[in-house]
């Protein structure tokens, strides 16, 4: 009987150690996701380096599309990534009513909490969509706003104009389709050229196209001295860059929310645009730009 009791005690102790070890491992390991363009690659790299420096076991998985990444997080394959409030609200939750930046954040935060995704503090970086033209060309045509552009496209002078768009913008609920609906315009297929996100800036700069969609915080907008058209009907929602984390990951890592909020507080339009430009204009590596930023801010 004593041998049985001793054996049971030993088994219980081993099991307890295994459970504690497994819990510690789960609590310390995080999968950081990201999309496939510069800003997202910077943020996933920066977050992975930052968390690794804090002692977490980090697995970085980026280069995904928006829908694939969202699905991976919902399925528990990704613990956290940086999403945009407008994308979360319109694309994932199908809310199309016009809301203020604050209400956009509060609404998507409340909706996603129901599916176990927690939106932490939003940054001041608003990577909204925009339309841009070469500054001299826009001035020549007297175009200042999207309405001016739409009017020009219907004229004899502008009927053959070419617009560049990446594939995602042309397909998204909050992209080209809703833009054209908001401005009551039908764009013939011959006027639209779909291409990789990185090529739209070159296409406009090299006069291959006359108009292009851009991301507001992309460093190439300033580098190429493009003119960003006024969204005079306030169509595009706010796209505040925000860390979104699985509720289970936050529960397993009590300090994680505060740690990510520190990083979020450092991001604004100017900072994000500058970081993007270091990669896309100056040719520095994603890892180097991310590490330098962390070091400069005492986070690494």
Regions found by a protein language model. Name each.
Residues 103-162, 265-269:
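A conserved helix-loop-strand patch within extracytoplasmic ligand-binding domains
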Residues 29-47, 62-68, 168-171:
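Extracytoplasmic "Venus flytrap"
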Residues 129-139, 240-253:
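A bilobed periplasmic-binding-protein/Venus flytrap-type ligand-binding module shared by bacterial periplasmic
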């Amino acid at each position: 009987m004593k041998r049985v009791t001793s054996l049971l005690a030993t088994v219980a102790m081993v099991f307890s150690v295994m459970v504690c070890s497994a819990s510690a491992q789960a609590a310390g390991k995080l999968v950081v996701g990201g999309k496939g363009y510069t800003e997202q690659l910077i943020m996933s790299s920066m977050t992975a380096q930052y968390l690794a420096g804090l002692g977490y076991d980090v697995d970085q998985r980026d280069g995904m599309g928006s829908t694939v990444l969202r699905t991976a997080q919902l399925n528990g394959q990704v613990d956290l990534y940086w999403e945009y409030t407008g994308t979360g609200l319109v694309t994932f939750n199908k809310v199309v009513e016009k809301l203020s930046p604050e209400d956009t954040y509060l609404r998507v935060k409340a909706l996603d909490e129901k599916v176990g995704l927690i939106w932490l503090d939003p940054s001041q970086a608003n990577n909204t969509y925009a339309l841009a033209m070469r500054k001299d060309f826009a001035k020549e045509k007297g175009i200042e706003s999207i309405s001016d552009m739409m009017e020009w496209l219907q004229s004899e002078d502008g009927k053959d104009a070419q617009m560049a768009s990446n594939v995602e913008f042309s397909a998204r609920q909050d992209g080209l389709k809703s833009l054209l609906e908001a401005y009551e315009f039908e764009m013939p297929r011959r006027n639209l050229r779909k291409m990789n996100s990185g090529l739209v800036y070159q296409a406009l700069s090299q006069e291959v196209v006359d108009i292009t969609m851009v991301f507001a915080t992309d460093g190439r907008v300033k580098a190429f001295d493009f003119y960003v058209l006024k969204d005079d009907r306030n169509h595009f929602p706010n796209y505040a860059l925000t860390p979104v984390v699985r509720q289970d990951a936050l529960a397993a890592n009590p300090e994680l929310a505060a740690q990510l909020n520190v990083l979020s507080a450092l991001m604004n339009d100017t900072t994000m645009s500058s970081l993007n430009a270091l990669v896309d204009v100056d040719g520095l590596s994603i890892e180097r730009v991310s590490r330098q930023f962390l070091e400069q801010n005492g986070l690494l």
